Amino acid sequence: MSSSGSDKERETFVYMAKLSEQAERYDEMVETMKKVARVNSELTVEERNLLSVGYKNVIGARRASWRIMSSIEQKEESKGNESNVKQIKGYRQKVEDELANICQDILTIIDQHLIPHATSGEATVFYYKMKGDYYRYLAEFKTEQERKEAAEQSLKGYEAATQAASTELPSTHPIRLGLALNFSVFYYEIMNSPERACHLAKQAFDEAIAELDTLSEESYKDSTLIMQLLRDNLTLWTSDLPEDGGEDNIKTEESKQEQAKPADATEN
């Protein structure tokens, strides 16, 4: 196929992905953007964001289902309803299989197609952050050795992203702030290390505050919103809430979608 022909096909895929997003058909959005990602050329910012939004919604729905099922399972166990617990476990396993497949799917694309063709510092940070995120999602439901391995890979992804961000992106850049937000949640939830989580979140917040006057108009809304989420988590983590009081209120970067318009918010 000629270059112009393949460009036209790519434009068609991107348009179909946008259409799928508007129709909230995220599984189809992901399938379409996977075709673009496998072309083996660097994605544009728009293409990168479409791929990210599609996967965030596809994985987000299953993560929510898993949390609900786990909560119901605990309640049924406490009541001693063994037959119900057995049913829930089987259903939860189905969701876990879906979660694992989605994570492995995007992680393969990141390793084989996205990172090797990333030429900008921004893209490199973006993809390593995604790697950290999707291994973190695996660590949320895996157990024992598999959980340990997922957590180790998540840490490697976040560390690689952080190293690149520290030299390539200003402290106020929304992608760098989103990385700090999700990395701090990783320390809090997966590594059970609230001190590390608070230190990371506070450092990112303080560094961004110090450079706030350099913030560009185009990223002001995104950056200040993520800074607010960092501060919300710091407040939550450092307060004397009862042990069962705060988990559901922890903010990750996906929380932006609840506060800003999902259709036009810049995804990071």
From Swiss-Prot:
What keyword terms does UniProt attach to this protein? Cytoplasm, Nucleus, Phosphoprotein
Example GO CC term: the record gives: cytoplasm
- Answer whether the UniProt record assigns the keyword Cell inner membrane to this protein: no
Q: Which domain of life is it from?
A: Eukaryota
Basic and acidic residues compositional bias, start-end:
248-261
Please give the residue positions where the record annotates the modification Phosphoserine.
S70, S193
Point out residues bearing the modification Phosphothreonine.
T214
Record's Gene3D superfamilies? Answer: 14-3-3 domain (1.20.190.20)
> Where in or outside the cell is it found?
Nucleus; Cytoplasm
Which tissues carry this protein?
Expressed in flowers.
Summarizing the function annotation, the protein's role is: Is associated with a DNA binding complex that binds to the G box, a well-characterized cis-acting DNA regulatory element found in plant genes.
Give the record's family classification: Belongs to the 14-3-3 family.
**What name appears for this protein in its UniProt entry?**
14-3-3-like protein GF14 iota
What is the source species?
Arabidopsis thaliana
